[in-house]
């Protein structure tokens, strides 16, 4: 286990915002990631360490199911260096104002869903960001759970996301014991991953 740890939390929580509603958690986008979601200094750190943020108010439609494999660690602000498991990302219900529903899965035991997710970008370039809860269970036992900000960037093509990059920032975490807690990122640290073959394949 261990690699998994993109720090995230236990209760699955999917956005119930409908077309025409105001957002509940994340401000409506103006083509940039709001500093209330990711601070200016953290955005600067992401950029400085190789993560791309595609800004703009006309992002492409990125609905679909995508497989990022292999997902390679590019940078970890907490010094983490272990393996990361392949990631399945599901994006549905994209609205004109950029709202979308996002969920992810690793190894069938690590599941996460967005509270709210939004897409910004231009032409075929996009960045999706959201608050997310993720957890890992073993049978009826929850091993750990976390709350994170997740960010995914890339170029949307018929084959999938080219130059796919995945990052998360830890907001809150808890675990069943010290071992699992030690595998989770510390508060406000972040990790950046690249798809190893530079394509998160569209599988549905």
Name each model-derived stretch.
Residues 17-80, 192-204:
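Amphipathic/hydrophobic helical signal segments and adjacent flexible N-terminal regions
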Residues 68, 72-114:
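N-terminal glycine/threonine-rich, aromatic-flanked beta-hairpin/loop signature
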Residues 94-161:
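Contiguous, well-ordered beta-strand patches that form the walls/edges
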Residues 1-3:
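Bacterial N-terminal signal peptides that target proteins for export
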Residues 143-204:
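Glycine-rich, aromatic-bearing surface loops/beta-hairpins
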Residues 64, 87-89, 152:
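Residue-level detector of short, conserved catalytic/binding motifs and their immediate flanks
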